[in-house]
C-alpha cells in the first residue's frame, strides 16, 4: 500500500508547503481536485496541465487520482433531460482527458447532488445510468484511466448508489473496463458495512481507496477503526493507494496541524510511509 493525500486538505496557495510535508511523511503521490489546476479545468490549457504535472512530479509526488470532478457545477446532473446529460458527458470527457494529461489513472466520481434521482424510479434511474457510464467507461478505457464510482451515503445528500454493495453491483452491470469501484472508509462507517466483506466483494474492478472519516473530518478523529481497515486491506492483498481525504477545516483551525495528525495516524495504521512494509 502506498500513501497519497487529496489536495483539498490544504489551501490552494500552500501546495509547496504541503508537498514538503507529504514527502517528509513518506507519501508516494497526490490526489487532485480539477478546480485546483485552473478555474475552468474542462478547458485547461496544455501548458498549464504540463506545468501542474511537473510541479508535483518534480517533488516526487505523481498525481495518482482526481476527485471533486464536478465541483462548482451544480447545473450538470445525471437525471435531468437528455440535454443535461449531454452537457454532463462533455464535462466528464474533458475531465477524463485532463486526468490523462496529468498522468492520473483514477478519477473518483462522487458528486452526490449531481446524481440525485429525486422522484425518478430506481429502475429507470439505473437504466439511464448504465447507458451513461457504459459510454464514459469506454472513453476512460481509451484514455488509459479508470472512472471510479464512489458510494455516497444519504448523509451526503445522495439517493443513488449510496453504499458500497450498490456500487459494486452497478459497476458489474455496466461491465466496462474503464469503469471501476472506489471504496471509502468514512462511507463504510456511515452505512455500517463490513469492510472485509465489502473488499472481498469488490473484486478486480476495485481501483482506489480513501482513508476518511464521516463528514471528511480529520482522519483519526471520527471513530473509524483505521487499524481494522488496514487489516482488511492486507487481507485481500490490496496494493493500491491509500489516499487521505479530508477538508482543510473551518476558519480558525490549522490545516498544518490537521494534516500532520492525519498523516501520523494513516502511516501508523496502514504502514503506508515510503519504505514501510507493503500490503
Give the predicted meaning of each segment.
Residues 9-11, 34-36, 69-72, 113-115, ...:
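Active-site-proximal loop/turn and secondary-structure-junction residues that shape catalytic pockets
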Residues 28-29, 62, 105, 146, ...:
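Residue-level detector of anion-binding/catalytic polar loops
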Residues 16-23, 42-62, 89-103, 130-139, ...:
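Short amphipathic alpha-helices and their capping/turn segments at secondary-structure boundaries
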Residues 16-17, 58, 75-180, 190, ...:
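Active-site acidic/histidine proton-transfer and metal-coordination neighborhood
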Residues 33-53, 111-113, 117:
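Glycine-rich, proline-tolerant flexible connector loops at the mouths of alpha/beta enzymes
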Residues 38-43, 157, 252-257:
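Short, flexible/disordered intra-domain loops and linkers
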Residues 1-4, 9-26, 89, 103-104, ...:
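Histidine-acidic metal/acid-base catalytic patches
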Amino acid at each position: 500500500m502506498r500513501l497519497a493525500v487529496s489536495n483539498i486538505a490544504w489551501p490552494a496557495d500552500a501546495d509547496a508547503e504541503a508537498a514538503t510535508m507529504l514527502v517528509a511523511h513518506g507519501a508516494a503521490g497526490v490526489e487532485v481536485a480539477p478546480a485546483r489546476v485552473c478555474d475552468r479545468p474542462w478547458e485547461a490549457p496544455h501548458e498549464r496541465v504540463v506545468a501542474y504535472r511537473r510541479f508535483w512530479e518534480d517533488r516526487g509526488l505523481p498525481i495518482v487520482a482526481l476527485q471533486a470532478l464536478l465541483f462548482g457545477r451544480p447545473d450538470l446532473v445525471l437525471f435531468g433531460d437528455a440535454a443535461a446529460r449531454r452537457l454532463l458527458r462533455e464535462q466528464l470527457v474533458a475531465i477524463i482527458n485532463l486526468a490523462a494529461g496529468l498522468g492520473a489513472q483514477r478519477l473518483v466520481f462522487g458528486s452526490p447532488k449531481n446524481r440525485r434521482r429525486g422522484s425518478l424510479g430506481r429502475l429507470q434511474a439505473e437504466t439511464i445510468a448504465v447507458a451513461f457510464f457504459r459510454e464514459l467507461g469506454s472513453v476512460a478505457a481509451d484514455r488509459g484511466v479508470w472512472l471510479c464510482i464512489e458510494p455516497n451515503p444519504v448523509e451526503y445528500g445522495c439517493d443513488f448508489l449510496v453504499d458500497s454493495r450498490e456500487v459494486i453491483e452497478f459497476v458489474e452491470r455496466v461491465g466496462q473496463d474503464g469503469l471501476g469501484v472506489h471504496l471509502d472508509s468514512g462511507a463504510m462507517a456511515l452505512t455500517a458495512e463490513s469492510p472485509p466483506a465489502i473488499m472481498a466483494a469488490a473484486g478486480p474492478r476495485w481501483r482506489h481507496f480513501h482513508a476518511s472519516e464521516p463528514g471528511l473530518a480529520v482522519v483519526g478523529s471520527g471513530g473509524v477503526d483505521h487499524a481494522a481497515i488496514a487489516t482488511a486491506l492486507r487481507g485481500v492483498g490490496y496494493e493500491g493507494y491509500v489516499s487521505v481525504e479530508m477538508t482543510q477545516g473551518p476558519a480558525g483551525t490549522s490545516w498544518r496541524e490537521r494534516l500532520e495528525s492525519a498523516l501520523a495516524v494513516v502511516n501508523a495504521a496502514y504502514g503506508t510511509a515510503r519504505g514501510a512494509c507493503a500490503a
